[in-house]
């Protein structure tokens, strides 16, 4: 019986993780749950899964719900130190990191040091601090990817040697604006950007998918997870979202992992690895889908993808800067403060404000803070 903590249980990945856990009551139990601010759903989840430790990042939500949780015998906490304590609870085997942003950074690092398994659904952690996390991780042992693309690559590489890999092909649906012209992209609305053609996800990642920044972040994550140089990682647009990624080998063979666009599949694969168990999820019917198509990404219409690849290749603090600036720019777009194409423009401006420095965790956290502040200033009209 694996004892799990879920950081981000009320979000899309967290809710689907709990669905998977419910399929296998004899294999998993939930020890603690953490959420940003949805106290109502968090309490429902705690009661349903008999959880006694809970966390709310938002202080106001914490104050609102503290007594209600206490009435049910559940200890509710808040603050970054308490989130870390949650991840390090005695007897915990693994942690699903599914809160977007860098809030999972310290819990991930300390949990790895403490010998726990990380089920990585938070790509920002690896993007911002890949250089620090890589020496601590053993892929397939103490860290398992949950992202569908990285799960696909991980599955395709089973039993293979990295020396045989010619190229990783990371697929992207192309988002809701795949066929839009640059002129059309100037005036897209938040509502339009949130209509992803294939996946049901949280707001932040849905906007990242619309700008293709998400694919850029995934390329950086793949670089660190699989220790593959950027020159060997290539994005490809695949509108049907059936092939989740491919690995091309030097002998000309290409291995692809296929499945319906349903995050419960890669979540289950990570949690039950190295075994596979039957479930009640719908399966893939290729004759119903009929056609699988592929296109090259357009870097002019989707500059965020190019920025991410450039930041990845530059290394050092640049992926962390990219990630932090993007988070603030996406927040601003969702709030109606900037236009869609301005997301990448803000990120580029912030990237241009930084120079390489000596890398450590403290530096990454400082850079993350500074990049966010600069992004807010650019959005507010300062430093034009």
Swiss-Prot record:
Cofactor(s) the protein requires to work: Mg(2+); Mn(2+)
Keyword Mitochondrion on entry: no
GO molecular function (one): NADPH binding
Keywords assigned: Isoprene biosynthesis, Manganese, Metal-binding, NADP, Oxidoreductase
InterPro entries documented for this protein: DXP_reductoisomerase (IPR003821), DXP_reductoisomerase_C (IPR013644), DXP_reductoisomerase_N (IPR013512), DXPR_C (IPR026877), DXPR_C_sf (IPR036169), NAD(P)-bd_dom_sf (IPR036291)
Pathway: Isoprenoid biosynthesis; isopentenyl diphosphate biosynthesis via DXP pathway; isopentenyl diphosphate from 1-deoxy-D-xylulose 5-phosphate: step 1/6
Chain sites annotated for binding NADPH: 10-13, 36-38, 122, 124, 202
Function in brief: Catalyzes the NADPH-dependent rearrangement and reduction of 1-deoxy-D-xylulose-5-phosphate (DXP) to 2-C-methyl-D-erythritol 4-phosphate (MEP).
The name this protein goes by in its record: 1-deoxy-D-xylulose 5-phosphate reductoisomerase
